[in-house]
Amino acid sequence: MKQNRRFFLPYLLALAGLTAAFYVMSALCADPGVLEMRGFEYVMVMMQIGMFVAGVLSAVLLLYINSFLMKQRKKELGLYNILGMGKGNIALIQCWESLFTAILGIGGGLVLGVAFHKLATLALVPLLKFSIPFHGSASLPAMVETAVFFGFLLLLALALNLFRVRLSNPIELLHGGNVGEKEPRTRWLMAAVGAVCLGAGYFIAVTVKDPALAMLLYFLAVLLVIIGTYCLFTAGSIALLKLLRKNKGFYYQTGHFIGVSGMLYRMKRNAVGLANICILSTMVMVMLSGTLALYLGQGEIIAAQYPANLNMTVSFDPAQNQDLDLDGAASLVNRFAREQGVPVTGVDAAEYLHFNVLANPATGRLEVGAQGENTDRRALYLLTAQGYAALTGDRAPSLQPGEAAVCGALPEGFGPELTIQGIDGGREVGDPQSLHSAQALPEIEYFRTTFDMNEPLCLVVSDRTMLARLWALQSQALDNYAANRTAVLLVDLECTNEEELALVDAWADASVNEGFFDGTGTWEYWRVESRAEMAVDGYGMAGGFLFLGIVLGIIFLMATVLIIYYKQVSEGYEDQGRFEIMRKVGLSQRQVKSSIRGQVLIVFFLPILVAAVHILFDFNLVARMLTMFGVRNVMTVVLCTGGTLAAFLAVYVLVYLLTARTYYKIVK
C-alpha cells in the first residue's frame, strides 16, 4: 500500500469522505431530537433519500476505483506469483490490505462523520429558520449502519479481486497493466442513436410548458440525455478523431499526432470516462441550482401568500344559501385575539372567485368547462376592487359595472373586450358575461405564487354583484364541480412567532365549541393559516432540499474529481513509455509539454462544456417544475443556475491545474 500510495491515498480519502457523508445523514435520521421539532417530516424524508442516493453512488464509485487499482497492480501481483508466492498468499495479502483499508477508511470516516454531524446540525439551523433540538452526540446505531454498509462494499470489492486473481495466470497478471485496446471501429448506428436520444431529450426539455407534464417527463428527458451523452461521447468522439487523422495537414504535426493517435487507441475507455464526468457535473449543477432557487424563493412565496400574520380562508356556497358576514367575522377575530392577550393591528377582508378556464384562441373567449390543451388553460381569479386593495395595500381601482382591471398580462391574442362563456359537454350554457378591460394593474403576488399548475389570470371587477353573476355562470357549466365563493381575512398581529403559533392552536381548540362562530353568517369551512407556521413548513422543505443538495453535490463532486484524477494518472502511466520513445527520437521538452497540455485541455474541458449545454437546455424544464412549488420568479432561477455554473467551473479549473501537474510529473 505504501508503494502504491499515489493510488491508495485518494481511495482512502474517498472512502473516508463517503463514509462521513453517509454517517451524517444516518445520524440526523437517528437523532431523537428530530422528532421533537416542527417540520421533522421534511428533514427525515430528505435524509432518507440522501442515504439511498449516497449509498448507490458510493457502491458504484468504490467498485470503479477498486477495478482501476487492480489493473494498475496486476504487474506487481504477477511478479509475486512468478517469484514463488502462491495465489493463496496473494489472496492473504489482499485480505490484509482490505482490513487496513477498512480500519483507515471507515474508521477515519466515522471520526470525521461525528465531527461533521455537529457542523451539519449548526448548518441546518440557518437553513431551516427555526431552532433544532438536536443532541449532536455520536450515534451508535448510525455508526453501526454505516460501518456495516461500507464493510459490505469492501468485502464485495475483495471478492471481485480474489475472483480475478483466481482466474488469471502469472503471465496475464504480469502484463495485465500493459494490455491495450485495439483501435475502435466507427459505430455510426450508435452515433445516430445518441443524436436521436439527445435531440429528443433536448426537445422535451425546451418545449414542455405545463408544470405537471414537466414533472412527469423530467426523468424521461434525463434518461434520453444520459443515453445520448454516452453514445455520442463513445461513437462521435471516435468518428471525430478519425476525421482529424484523415486531415494530413492537421494530423502530421507533432502535438496533434501524439494527442490524436494516443487518445484514439484508448477511446472506448476514455469516452466512457468523459461521459461519466459530464453526467456527474450536470447532476451537481442541476441539484445545487434547483435546490438553491427553491430555497431562495421561499421568502418571496411566504411574503406573497401571507401578507398578514394570519390568513383565514372562508368558503361558502351560494347554491346552499350560504353567505359570510364579513363584519361579523372580523369582530370574532378581534374579540378572540384580545381574549388571548395578542394585539390585533388590523383585519382586512378580500372576497374572490377561483376556477379554471380555457383561453380559447379559436373563439377568443375564456371558456369555463371547455376541454383543450393544458398550455391554453388559466387559473382565473376574480375579485372586487375592495378585495384588490386588501390583498395588495394599493388604492382600489375605480370601475364601472361591466368593466374590469387586468392584473398582469392577458393571454396571447386576447384584446380589451373579454367574454366569459360556460361550456358543458361541448355546448354553450348560461349567460355569457362580457367585461371591458379598462385598466392594467401589476400582477397580484398573492395569486401568482400559488401552487396552481395553470398560469394565473386575475381580473378585478366592480362589485359583489358581478362576482355573483360569474359564480352562477361557472356553476351552470361545472355543475357538481363548481367552485365556492371564497373570502380571506388578513389579520395583522403584534406578537412573536411563538405567540402567533399559540394563538392558532388556541383558535383550533376553541372553534369546536358550540356557538363559537355565531354572528359570522353561514359557510362551508373556515381554515386558519399562519405565516410563522408556513415559514416552518416552507423552510423545512426547502432547507432540507438545499442541505441534501449540498451534501449530495459534494459527493458527486468528489466522484467527479476522483474519476478525473484516476483517469489522468492511468493515462500518464500509459503515455510514459510513449513519450520516452518520442524524446529519444528528438522531441524537445517544450514539445512534450505542449502536447500534454493539449490532451489535458481536451480531456478536461469537453465534459464541462457539454454539461453547460445540458444545463442550458434543462433550464426550462427545471423552471417549470419549480412553479409547482410556488417559485415563479424566473430571474431567481437564472441567477442560481448562472452562479452555480460559474462556481462549479472555478472548482473544475482548480482540479485541472492540479491534475495537469500530476500528469506531467508522471510522463516526465
Predicted features by range, described:
Residues 301-558:
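Basic-flanked hydrophobic alpha-helices used for secretion and membrane insertion
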Residues 27-38, 110-142, 199-217, 607-668:
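Short helix-loop junctions at transmembrane helix boundaries
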Residues 8-12, 48, 143-148, 188-192, ...:
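Hydrophobic alpha-helical transmembrane segments
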Residues 100-244:
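Hydrophobic alpha-helical segments
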Residues 64, 72, 164, 210, ...:
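Juxtamembrane interface at the cytosolic side of transmembrane helices
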